[in-house]
Amino acid sequence: MSRFFARGGSDSESSSEDEQELYSDREEEEQFSDSEEESSEAESSEEESSDDEGAGASRFLKNVSESEESEDEERVTVVKSAKDKRLDELEGIIKAIENAEKINDWAVISSEFDKLNRQIVKVTQAGPTPKIYIQTVADLEDFVNETIAKQKSSNKKMNASNAKGFNAVKQRIKKNNKEYATLIEKYRADKDGFMAGGDEEPKPVISAPRISKVERVEAPVAVTATADDDGFATVGRGGKTLQYTPESILKHLRVIVESRGKKNTDRFEQIRTMEKLLEVAQNPYQRIRIYLTLISTRFDLTSSSSANYMSVDQWKLAQQEFSTLLSVLESNREYVVTEGAEEWEDDEKQPQVAAGETLHVPGSIVSYVERLDDELTRSLQQIDPHTAEYIERLSDEKELYTNLVRTQVYAEALTTSEKSDPRQDSLNRVIMRRLEHIYFKPAQVVTILEEGTWKSLPSNLASDITPRANSGEVTSLVQTLCNYLFRHSDGILRARAMLCQIYFLALHDQYYRSRDLMLMSHLTENIANFDVSTQILFNRTLVQIGLCAFRAGLVYEAQNTLSEVCGSGRQKELLAQGIILQRYSTVSPEQERLERQRQLPFHMHINLELLECIYLTSSMFLEVPLMAQTSSSPEMKRRVISKTFRRMLDYNERQVFTGPAENTRDGVIMSAKFLAAGDWKKAAEMLNSIKIWDLMPQPEKIKEMLSQQIQEEGLRTYLFTYAPFYDSVSIATLSNMFELPEKKIQAIISRMISHEELAAALDQVNNAIVFRKGVELSRLQSQIVTLADKSMNLLEANEKTLEQRTQGMANAFQRDQGAGARGGRGAGRGGQARGGPRFPGGQQGRRPGGQQFSGGALGGAIKA
């Protein structure tokens, strides 16, 4: 409720007489109003307004004489009654509740609701219940009901503090509103009419007529929203007049900018102020300055809220304002927003741009679009991906991508060809952002996105880097963006561009090209020197290459590529698709917060179940023949291709009862057991029955490839297992057994013979395989080879230990010279020192290489 203090009247009495009258009036007032609560406040003279008929009119009016004006020229004291102070406190609490509702901060709402109920008790002691309180509790109850409905339709849960506050408010609001049910019904029936009427004020009870020496008549003061003939105007905090004129725009903006980062700053009020300034802005410069400050203020709302991401409504408003800002800049080329420009200091006048000149405005268009991108990513991280809300939020990416392309076109017009130019760096950043939005998408999706983007852009906008005419060629688009970054950037941007291109090629089944680019980039050698986000992108690219190799039927390459990520058991963490919380983890809360910020949105995830299935299937094709080979060749037992697969297979074999396969992992293990037993048909049937293959492109082609691989590996397993029991075997028999062409069988056997995996020869005359006998080691020979291997391992370990202990001691074991000089042991006599025999003359022989430690008697026996 607005309260104004009017100055009125001009008395002809002297100042001394006036003072006496005031003092006498105050004494009489104290005598007649000791029982009243308002008399405790230091009120001005004897006036007491009887009935205020206008609800918005001020209740406290002060007559000031000319003498008082002369005394109060330097200081104006605003006197408020206790009731007005309580109403001010009530309005402050209500405003805090409204702000907390905008950001869904139920912890703040709960605490402020308690304060509100305590304050309303004090307010109602001196008058009726304020209508603003009825409005607040009614709207709060509606907001609680809306939140309950949203929680039922969404799987996303509140955090602990929010849920606690929400439950507390939900329980207390219904009980509280029962006391004001009648007033709340009136408010909901006609909200505007209810709030338009003033609060009914009780008439003050006058105990006795007041006697004063001078009777004063006060005229009612009308409160208006705009300036009138009496000099009244809308006032803000501190009694300052708020005037929004084109000339005062820069002053208002400077006040807003200077208040950034300070506590107790009402950013919503600042946003409303700038929206009003936009209405009175007259030239492009004013609109550009307002939009730059307005967008920054909307971003600041995130830092002051409990949520760590921008609300959807504020994000959309910021995105629309950013798009409007680009339109203003595109229409007025004489104004350029660039980093490092000098700020206009004179707020009294506007800068004038002569014809042909350019005015640089400080700011960063690229930083704004990057922040919009980051806020969208944070929002997608927080939303449950299995709800319609996620899909709806993801649709905002189209508008963001349009602004990215638009920003790129704007940056191209400002960029020079020098790498060191800050404008070139800005262009590189926005191109990198655009590339990161398309590298993981299929070509069909990117084509639709590009076509929609260029249709929504003005026809006069054109890009030299990515022309409008080539928007349909997705492969060419990615290649063009990457090549531009290769030429004009270095460091992290160049590495990320390379990884994005490799990922895109692997996603579209170009295995050999993506593999060659990865090898030529040498990123595998120095990826540890890059930041964590680039390492995550490297892991994603590596996994995509492995998946591409598997789709191409290159099982060995797929297993070898995927082993680094899948063999660690930390796929979620390495691919930034989840956090593995361990019981005794030493990760600090700050590290955990950073780890959560690095998580990728759900639509960018690689299916971990499919990834594990492909890795286990590839390991099965390599491990099962290897296990069959080592059963007859003990010297091969040390070879383990996949420890993960071996561990799962051993665990399954230890089970007393084995039921049917219940998940993808069990299906692969059961298929491996059938393959090891020689039943390749059941193995193929079990493997093809896994439903996850339907998630891959062309699933029938994948299943056909798997069946062929099982036939080939089944043949290899059969030969490794039963070779000791055959003298010869017909190729036609093997062809009928595994349903493979004879030429294919001959090729497989020839490869096994050339790799020395099979001791046999091809008899082309009889079309058969002849096995050689006596090549396999006997049991005793196998034990001797094992003992020799262990001894060599012990020798190598001893030499490494000696190297560590003798670093910087080159002559530590050259005892011949020192011992001879001291006349000690071994000097002048042909004794033997520890570690081996001495040569004639008392000098110990030194063998070339190593640290000259032979391993003692055992080492000598082995080397002999």
UniProtKB/Swiss-Prot annotation:
Gene3D superfamilies membership: Winged helix-like DNA-binding domain superfamily/Winged helix DNA-binding domain
Domain PCI: 602-776
One Pfam short name: PCI
Keywords from the UniProt entry: Cytoplasm, Initiation factor, Protein biosynthesis
Disulfide bonds: none
Main location: cytoplasm
Keyword Cytoplasm appears in the UniProt entry: yes
Residue span of region Disordered: 1-77, 815-864
One GO location term (cellular component): eukaryotic translation initiation factor 3 complex, eIF3m
Protein's GO biological process: formation of cytoplasmic translation initiation complex
Subcellular location(s) per record: Cytoplasm
Top-level taxonomic group: Eukaryota
Acidic residues bias spans: 14-54
MF GO annotations: RNA binding; translation initiation factor activity; translation initiation factor binding
Compositionally biased residues, Gly residues: 820-864
PROSITE patterns per UniProt: PCI (PS50250)
SUPFAM superfamilies, A to Z: Winged helix' DNA-binding domain
Family the UniProt entry places it in: Belongs to the eIF-3 subunit C family.
Subunit details: Component of the eukaryotic translation initiation factor 3 (eIF-3) complex.
HAMAP family per UniProt: eIF3c
Role, per record: Component of the eukaryotic translation initiation factor 3 (eIF-3) complex, which is involved in protein synthesis of a specialized repertoire of mRNAs and, together with other initiation factors, stimulates binding of mRNA and methionyl-tRNAi to the 40S ribosome. The eIF-3 complex specifically targets and initiates translation of a subset of mRNAs involved in cell proliferation.
Descriptive protein name: Eukaryotic translation initiation factor 3 subunit C
